[in-house]
Structures are given as C-alpha cells and as structure tokens.
Amino acid sequence: DIINALQPGKKGRSFRQVVMIDYPRPGLKTIGFVTNELDIQEGSNTEGYISVYLPNPPNPTSGFLVLVPRSDVHVIDMSVEEGLKLVLSGGIVTSGLLKCKV
C-alpha cells in the first residue's frame, strides 16, 4: 500500500491532500500527507483527528504517522505530486509560496 500511496493518480488508497502542521513544536512547519480521518474517544469526549504521514526526505518510504486534531491541520493548495516533489527535493522545488486553503 505504501508504494501505491507514493504514486499519484493510482486508484485505491493513497495520499489524499498535502497539509502543513506545526511540528515538532509550535512555529515550525512540517509538510505532510493526509492518509485518513478518524475520531478518537477519550472518556465521554470524542474529537476528530486526521492521520498525517510525515515522510523523511529524500526517501519518502521512511517517515512516521501523527494523529493531528482537525483544527491544527492546514490544507495546502497543491497536488500530491507537487507535494512529493517539494519533499523529495528537500524544499528546492517550490514556487516560493505555499497557499493554505481557507
């Protein structure tokens, strides 16, 4: 499944959107890819989360998964293919402006 996820345009499970989150601390931005959405219940409280895969450049098959509250995820206005190029190039291949969708 990870190989399919890294091939934009393939049918089935794949990265859905390019997003930006504060990671590893507030103020530092990290590019990731939405893999799923889920709810987490703690006691009587249920909150919506987004599964975000954070690839390690230059090898995107190495990375890790974080579950981020929906309110902390910012969707970037770019295709998954453009996002992969950005990550694989270490940030070299970019237009110089990342626009978040409102």
Identify the residue ranges that each predicted region occupies:
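Transmembrane alpha-helices and immediately adjacent membrane-cytoplasm interface residues
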Residues: 1-4, 8-10
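Terminal membrane-proximal soluble interaction domains of membrane-associated proteins
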Residues: 14-102
